Structure formats: structure tokens, C-alpha cells
């Protein structure tokens, strides 16, 4: 066995990383997204039962993920493992292609490529997720690997290479329309080859086979839906374009997106490690040499850079400039390409100190950029990379195997920083607890059981019930509860899970009061940090918020609840009415004042205060809304909300909303002050200052 491993150490490395992908699921699984992924689960279940509708939902046209997931459900039932298996298999196949593309390298080079692919946090996180991005990564990488293998003579027959290439592209098409980002890459290789009169038969066969596949695909769509372009229509009517379009946004956002936006996003999410070194071998070549790709060693570096440029600049729409939504998962297809391109660069550097100035400079740039991301793990990772690179840079050349291996292992350990943190998050996650709670206490409960919860938790529960909505209990969301017709014999449960509430994009204060406070008459069933289940006899037992006081100020007239602002009123800008209140640079606005003693007569011990202010500023990051509780000149509580949470209202106006709860027993003698703090160098303007107190 030992001799076999020594003789096949690269294959053993591949097997070890494949095992890591499997172990990551069983040890570090955190949760489902609860939205897109479980929509795929629902559609896969529909497909398995022959009920999939090709309507205006573009997810229904992603047949690769739906087909493999439906097959998994057919074989193993609808379980978390069955949902994860297809993605894990796809990830391991992609890992194998990375291994195959770097097998000719030194063992350490192959090790580095496998490490960069597997340990990029977003890639590892998605290796067991029911999402199409990993499927598109496989199709993209497979097509490029086929081209490279044919160019290098490892695939000799052009029709075999053309067929493999076409199947790979078509698989990606069936996975996600974002494959359009690979079009510039394919065109780049095609034009390069045709101008050099190379591989012409391969490209003729590839385009012919792919064209036949696409024609057959459009024919099937026409047969199924009555329109060959039904998928295009579904994508055009989806919310994706609304989320991604820059047509109605300030030009500064567009400029930011296509300049520093994506690199900074990649740095913040530790997505840059494989990408950052891939360009370095090309810096000594002329543009003509880069375009010709005459050196096989430069192929993947060239392809990676073209793919990055496409990802950054290419629009996904013909009507408006709509680049791919700036979320790392949409760009996972870059990681395997970059891993293959970067591995020989790092081997050359750590073994022979090649590219030494470029590697050091690039490491320093990314480490510096990480300091501005606000992500401590990104800072640790990239500053650590800079440290390892710097040590190798300043140490005298030493090609001893032990020294080189030490540098490679040190680099790989840095890649583990975020994955280890993710595993710890998964271990601490309450996903298994909430799943057990639902299965043991709610699924199969009384025919009269109704569970009120957040949107994602409801989706989780329906998934656990295998989407058999007729089964008990009935699930409704917080938003549906006010309109739901309860029956007299209904047993009402409230399930509050802070994790799924966050996935539902609900803040602590967005959820109703009865999700935060258990009524005295309720029957507690389960209570732990962030996960609560209780039962009440009727709807009236649910605790609801009611407004007990509202104050507003548009600064048109004096208001005794605010400090004097007569000298700050201006007609230069206003949101409503004729005037607003000006706040000087590095100064404070008029303060709203509320003695808590005025609230002690109410029945509740805790009140919820909502402050809403409209602010006109061009430096929103330099503005804070401050809520301060003072007693006898001493600050008891201090809270603030910065500009990153403000909502744009148009014309440089922003709406700031700040929520805060106060315990009246602790603050009965204190006074609340609310004001705007302008930390910037220019005057700002405020209007429609509103305070509401709820109990």
C-alpha cells in the first residue's frame, strides 16, 4: 500500500481533497440558503413527480441541477444528503479536472492547484449546496480543458474533442445562463486559432455540433412551451435584472463596479487567492504573444485573465448595462481556471524564486487592500500570505525539498483560515436543532396545528415534509398571519429561529413582537438561544405592538420636544414643506428630548422606539443618528446608526431609521436625546424627523 501511494502520490492527493469535500458536508454543513436552493429542491420534486411547469420562472429551465437532484431524490428520498450528493459529485469531478490539468506539474504544483480550488472558501462552501454555480463551473472548466488537451495533442481526433467541448458547453447552458460570461473566452481562443490557421477542423466540428445541440434544445422548448425563446422570456421577466441593472443608479456606482468594486469584493471574501497570481507570467510578454498563446504554459493564465475581464465588464443584457450581480458565488467558474494557472507560478516562486518581485508586489497590494475590507479573516489570510512570500523573498535561495515543502504547507495552512472558521460556524449552527425540533414536535402533529414563523423557516418545514403541503401542520409566515382565518379549534404554535429570520432578511425589529416575547399564558415547548417554540390557545394571546406616542417635526414651525433650531432653518433644501434644518460640518442637529418618566404609566416594562429622519448629504458615510440616555449628566446608554444602513430617497436624500428597545425599570429617571451627528466636512440638511414609541 505504501509503495502504491508513493508511486501514485498525485492521485492520493486528489483522493484526499475529494474526501475533504465529503467530510466538509458531514462536519461543517451550516444551513441551506432557504430561498433559491429550496426552490430547486421543490422543482426537482415536481420533476420527479412529472409536475414541473416551464412557466416564467427561469429556475425551471436549469435542467442539469433539476435532473440530477430529482434522480437523487428518486433514489434516496428528499433528505439533506440527497440534496447535497449531486453537488458533491459535480465538485469532485471538477476537482478531478483540476488534477488532470496539473498532473504534468511537480507533485507540489498539483498539491497547490488542488488546494487553491478546494480551499477557496466560497468554492468549498458550495460543494454541497443545491445551487447551479458549481454545475456551471464544471461545464466551463471542462470545455477549456478539452481545448487545451486538443491543442497539446492529448486528444488526437478533432471530432472527439469537438463532441466533448460541445457537451461541456451545453451542460453549462443547462445549468445557468451566466455561461454567457464564457463567450468572450471562447471567442478569444477561436479567433486566435483561426488567425493562426490552427485547429480549424476542431472549431468547425465544435461549432457544428454545438449548433445542432442548441437547435434541438430550442425545438424541445418550442414543443414544451410553444415558444423556442421561453427561457429568454423567463429570464427577462425575473428579478435578476432589477437587482443587477445600473440604468437607474448613480454613475459613481457603475464606475465603482467596473473599476475597484469586484476586486475589493473578491478580497473581502477571500476569493482572490487563486486569482491574484494568475496574471504574473503574462507581464513579461507582448500583447501579440499573449494573443497567440504559443507557449502552452501560458494558456491557463491567459484564459483566466480574459475570463476575469469578462466577469468584470460584460453585460448580461442587450438593453441595459447589467453586469453579473456582485456576489462571489456567481463567479465560481473563475476559481478552477485560476487554480490551474496559479499553481505553477507559486511552485516556481517557492522552489526557485522566479517572478519574485511580481509575487511580492502583488501580495503586498492585496494585503493592503484587505485592510480596507473590514473582514478580519481576510486581513489575517492576505497579510499571512504576504508574510510567507516575504520570508521566501528575503531568504537566500535554497532548493532543498524540505524548505520548499515547508513554504507550500505554510501557504496551504493560510488557505484553511476561513474554511476552519466556516466549519466552526457549522458546528455551532442550530440547523440540526431546529430540524429535530420540527420533526419531533410539529410534523405529524394535530390536524388543527398552525405554525407561525418566518418565510425561510416555513420553506425549511415544507422541505422536511417533502413538499406535501396537505400534511400537518399548516405553516404560515408572520406576514400571512394577520390575514389568516384561524378556526376556533386551531392549536397555534409560534416558532422563532434567529438564523432563519436573518436568512429571511428580517431584522430583530421586523418580526412581530410575539416572536420576541413569549406570552405568560403560553405553553413553552422549546427555548434556547435563538430558537424558541411555544403554543397558545388562541390568536388573542399573541403579544402585539401598539403605538403609544408619535412625535414628528418638519421644521416648518417651532416644536417644544426639540431643542432650539430657529437659527438652523433654511429654505435651500427641503423634502416636504418649504424648509429643512441645516447641520454644520462636524456638528450636531437639534435634539429630540424625551424623559422616560413620561412613559412609566404604561403597562409594559420595555418600549420599542423607532426614529426616522430624512438626511440630505453627499457624504452619507460621515453621518450618524445617535440615541443617548442620560441621567444626572451621566451617559447610561449610547447607540448610533451609521450611513451604511440608510436608504436612498433620491436627490442626495437618505432615509435613516433606527430601532432601539429600552427597559423602563432601569431608565425611569433618565432622559433620551436623539440627534444627527455630522462628522463630515460639509453641511448637511435634515427633514421629517419622526419619533414613535411602541409597547
Predicted regions and their residues:
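Short acidic/glycine- and proline-prone juxtamembrane loop motifs at membrane-interface regions
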Residues: 34-35, 61, 125-136
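Perimembrane helix-loop-helix junctions
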Residues: 1-4, 149-154, 181-215, 219, ...
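Membrane-embedded, lumen/periplasm-facing catalytic core of multi-pass transferases
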Residues: 363-460
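Loop-to-helix entry region of an early transmembrane alpha helix in multi-pass inner-membrane enzymes
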Residues: 59, 63-67, 76-93, 126, ...
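Hydrophobic, aromatic-rich transmembrane alpha-helices
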Residues: 96, 263-306, 338-351, 361-364, ...
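Membrane-lumen/periplasm interface segments of specific transmembrane helices
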Residues: 192, 202-284, 306-313
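Transmembrane-helix motifs of polytopic, lipid-linked glycan transferases
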Residues: 85-105, 142, 146
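Short helix- or helix-capping micro-motifs
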Residues: 18-21, 113-121, 125, 141, ...
Amino acid at each position: 500500500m505504501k509503495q502504491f501511494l508513493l508511486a501514485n502520490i498525485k492521485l492520493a492527493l486528489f483522493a484526499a481533497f475529494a474526501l475533504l469535500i465529503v467530510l466538509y458536508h458531514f462536519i461543517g454543513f451550516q444551513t441551506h440558503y432557504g430561498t433559491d436552493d429550496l426552490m430547486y429542491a421543490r422543482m426537482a420534486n415536481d420533476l420527479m413527480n412529472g409536475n414541473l411547469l416551464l412557466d416564467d420562472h427561469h429556475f425551471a429551465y436549469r435542467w442539469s441541477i433539476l435532473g440530477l437532484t430529482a434522480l437523487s431524490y428518486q433514489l434516496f428520498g428528499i433528505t439533506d444528503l440527497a440534496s447535497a450528493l449531486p453537488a458533491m459529485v459535480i465538485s469532485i469531478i471538477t476537482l478531478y479536472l483540476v488534477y488532470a490539468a496539473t498532473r504534468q506539474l511537480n507533485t507540489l504544483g498539483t498539491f497547490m492547484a488542488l488546494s487553491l480550488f478546494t480551499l477557496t472558501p466560497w468554492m468549498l462552501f458550495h460543494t454541497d449546496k443545491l445551487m447551479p454555480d458549481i454545475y456551471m463551473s464544471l461545464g466551463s472548466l471542462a470545455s477549456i480543458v478539452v481545448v487545451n488537451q486538443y491543442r497539446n495533442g492529448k486528444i488526437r481526433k478533432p471530432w472527439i474533442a469537438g463532441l466533448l467541448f460541445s457537451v461541456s458547453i451545453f451542460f453549462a447552458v443547462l445549468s445557468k445562463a451566466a455561461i454567457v460570461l464564457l463567450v468572450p473566452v471562447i471567442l478569444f481562443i477561436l479567433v486566435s486559432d483561426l488567425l493562426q490557421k490552427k485547429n480549424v477542423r476542431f472549431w468547425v466540428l465544435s461549432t457544428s455540433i454545438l449548433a445542432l445541440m442548441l437547435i434541438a434544445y430550442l425545438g424541445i422548448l418550442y414543443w414544451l412551451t410553444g415558444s423556442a425563446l421561453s427561457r429568454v422570456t423567463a429570464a427577462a421577466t425575473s428579478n435578476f435584472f432589477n437587482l443587477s441593472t445600473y440604468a437607474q443608479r448613480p454613475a459613481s456606482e457603475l464606475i465603482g463596479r467596473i473599476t475597484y468594486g469586484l476586486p475589493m469584493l473578491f478580497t473581502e471574501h477571500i476569493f482572490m487567492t487563486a486569482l491574484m497570481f494568475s496574471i504574473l507570467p503574462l507581464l513579461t510578454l507582448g500583447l501579440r504573444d499573449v494573443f497567440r498563446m504559443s507557449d502552452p504554459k501560458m494558456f491557463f493564465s491567459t484564459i483566466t485573465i480574459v475570463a476575469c475581464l469578462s466577469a468584470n465588464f460584460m453585460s448580461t443584457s442587450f438593453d441595459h448595462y447589467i453586469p453579473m450581480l456582485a456576489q462571489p458565488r456567481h463567479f465560481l467558474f473563475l476559481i478552477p481556471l485560476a487554480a490551474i494557472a496559479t499553481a505553477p507560478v507559486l511552485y516556481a516562486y517557492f522552489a526557485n524564486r522566479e517572478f519574485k518581485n511580481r509575487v511580492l508586489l502583488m501580495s503586498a497590494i492585496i494585503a493592503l487592500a484587505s485592510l480596507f475590507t473590514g473582514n478580519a479573516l481576510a486581513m489575517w489570510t492576505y497579510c499571512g500570505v504576504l508574510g510567507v512570500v516575504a520570508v521566501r523573498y528575503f531568504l537566500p535561495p535554497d532548493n532543498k525539498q524540505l524548505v520548499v515543502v515547508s513554504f507550500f504547507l505554510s501557504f496551504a495552512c493560510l488557505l484553511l483560515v476561513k474554511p476552519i472558521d466556516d466549519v466552526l460556524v457549522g458546528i455551532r449552527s442550530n440547523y440540526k436543532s431546529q430540524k429535530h425540533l420540527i420533526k419531533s414536535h410539529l410534523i405529524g402533529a394535530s390536524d388543527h396545528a398552525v405554525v407561525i414563523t418566518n418565510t425561510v423557516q416555513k420553506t425549511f418545514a415544507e422541505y422536511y415534509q417533502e413538499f406535501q403541503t396537505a400534511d400537518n401542520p399548516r405553516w404560515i409566515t408572520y406576514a400571512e398571519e394577520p390575514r389568516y382565518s384561524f378556526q376556533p379549534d386551531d392549536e397555534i404554535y409560534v416558532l422563532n429561529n434567529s438564523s432563519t429570520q436573518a436568512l429571511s432578511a428580517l431584522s430583530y425589529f421586523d418580526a412581530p413582537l410575539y416572536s420576541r416575547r413569549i406570552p405568560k399564558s403560553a405553553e413553552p415547548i422549546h427555548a434556547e438561544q435563538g430558537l424558541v417554540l411555544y403554543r397558545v390557545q388562541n390568536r388573542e394571546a399573541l403579544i402585539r405592538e401598539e403605538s403609544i406616542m408619535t412625535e414628528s417635526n418638519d421644521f416648518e414651525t417651532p416644536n417644544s420636544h426639540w431643542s432650539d433650531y430657529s437659527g438652523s432653518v433654511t429654505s435651500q433644501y427641503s423634502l416636504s414643506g418649504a424648509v429643512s434644518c441645516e447641520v454644520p460640518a462636524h456638528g450636531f442637529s437639534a435634539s429630540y428630548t424625551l424623559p422616560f418618566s413620561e412613559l412609566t404609566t404604561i403597562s409594559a416594562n420595555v418600549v420599542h422606539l423607532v426614529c426616522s429622519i430624512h438626511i440630505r448629504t453627499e457624504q452619507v458615510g460621515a453621518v450618524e443618528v445617535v440615541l443617548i440616555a442620560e441621567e444626572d449628566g451621566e451617559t447610561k446608554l449610547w447607540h448610533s446608526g451609521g450611513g451604511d444602513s440608510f436608504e436612498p430617497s433620491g436627490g442626495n436624500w437618505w432615509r435613516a431609521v433606527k430601532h432601539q428597545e429600552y427597559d423602563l425599570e432601569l431608565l425611569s429617571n433618565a432622559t433620551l436625546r436623539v440627534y444627527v451627528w455630522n462628522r463630515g466636512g460639509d453641511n448637511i440638511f435634515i427633514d421629517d424627523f419622526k419619533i414613535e414609541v411602541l409597547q
